Curated annotation (Swiss-Prot):
Record GO biological process: heme biosynthetic process
CDD domains: Ferrochelatase_C (cd00419), Ferrochelatase_N (cd03411)
Gene name per UniProt: hemH
Pfam families xrefs: Ferrochelatase
Name the UniProt record assigns to this protein: Ferrochelatase
Listed InterPro entries: Ferrochelatase, Ferrochelatase_C, Ferrochelatase_N
Organism listed in the record: Legionella pneumophila (strain Lens)
Sites where the protein binds Fe cation: 187, 286
Enzyme Commission number(s) from the entry: 4.98.1.1
């Protein structure tokens, strides 16, 4: 029997029309780990306030990045599976499961039902309850109802892994020029999620180094990722900035906000930036539309000149090698 490798990601609508996007957002936003309110307030918020207004706007955003091959997140993920399966040969059987949408986690686990062991790899370098935690919970809830449960290994995060850092840096390096400032833009989460992770402080600027109390702190893991990438890329502390994007609603999210950091950079005389999104392993709405289109327009309106968005790792050979190493180390 082969070992099973389950790759997990967030998901994508089936297509870019309003109906498909609304169905996707409904599944996503009613997840109690994403909007961590009691059930009734959460459903009122989602059904009455968010879905009616956000669905058309989100559909328009998806349409701006949709290709003949469909969703970039989906086809990059599928290409990753194909190339990784070729690299790992018969040692593993690999399946892709999306937390929301298709292919579902249930479908992916059904493909791996004959595997005697299962390695679960959420494709989120930094741990968060809303993404990693939700995907793992969904996976384990399905397995809990099976007659035969395989031996299980979970790779909770990999932000500190040298293979990930080196792969990310190699993809970024060709885009970095001498007179460019580097902006690391991570997906944001509400501040309250940081406190719920066990971290008892929310640092006003950068985060403290990783230690026992903040080892599951998403913000601390992001800052550590930036530090490791800067070291690999030989960037000085004045040559890069860390910020957080994609905030939703009026509650405080972790800071600094990507869309507010641009004015600060401009005020310092910075005109040219390279933006990398290290919390995303595959290009998607948040990288291609939010950063590649909207953030670039904002930068130019503020007086910025050159704006370069580096691609995510997608199905890059260095990323394939990194996953091989991370997974094989489990055995």
């Amino acid at each position: 029997m082969r070992r099973g490798l389950l790759l997990l990601n967030l998901g994508t609508p089936d297509n870019a029309d309003i109906r498909a996007v609304k169905l996707y957002l409904r599944e996503f936003l009613t997840d109690k780990r994403v909007i961590d309110l009691p059930t009734i307030p959460r459903y009122i918020l989602v059904y009455c306030l968010i879905l009616p207004f956000r669905s058309p706007k989100s559909a328009q955003a998806y349409q701006s990045i949709w290709t003949e091959k469909g969703s970039p997140l989906l086809y990059h993920s599928q290409n990753l599976v194909t190339k990784l399966q070729s690299a790992l040969k018969d040692e593993y059987k690999i399946a892709l499961g999306m937390r929301y949408g298709t292919p579902s986690i249930t479908t992916a686990l059904a493909e791996l039902k004959d595997c005697h062991s299962l390695t679960i790899l959420p494709l989120f370098p930094q741990y968060s309850s809303a993404a990693t935690g939700s995907a793992i919970e969904k996976t384990l809830s399905y397995l809990a109802n099976q007659e035969i449960i395989p031996s299980i290994k979970i790779i909770r995060d990999f932000y500190q892994r040298p293979e990930y850092i080196q792969a990310q840096a190699k993809i970024m390096k060709p885009y970095i020029k001498d007179n460019f400032h580097v902006l690391f833009s991570y997906h944001g989460i509400p501040e309250r999620h940081i406190h719920k992770s066990g971290c008892d402080t929310l640092c006003p600027q950068t985060c403290t180094p990783i230690y026992d109390k903040n080892q599951a702190c998403y913000r601390a893991q992001c800052y550590q990722t930036s530090l490791l990438l800067a070291k690999e890329l030989q960037l000085g502390t004045h040559q890069y900035t860390t910020a957080f994007q994609s905030r939703l609603g009026k509650t405080p999210w972790i800071k600094p906000y990507t869309d507010e950091i641009f004015a600060e950079l401009i005020s310092k005389g910075i005109k040219n930036i390279v933006v990398s999104c290290p919390s995303f392993v595959a290009d998607c709405l948040e990288t291609l539309e939010e950063i590649g289109i909207r953030a670039k327009e904002q930068w130019e309106k503020l007086g910025g000149e050159q704006f370069i968005l580096t691609p995510c790792m997608n199905d890059h050979p260095e990323w394939i090698k990194a996953i091989q190493s991370i997974v094989n180390e489990q055995f």
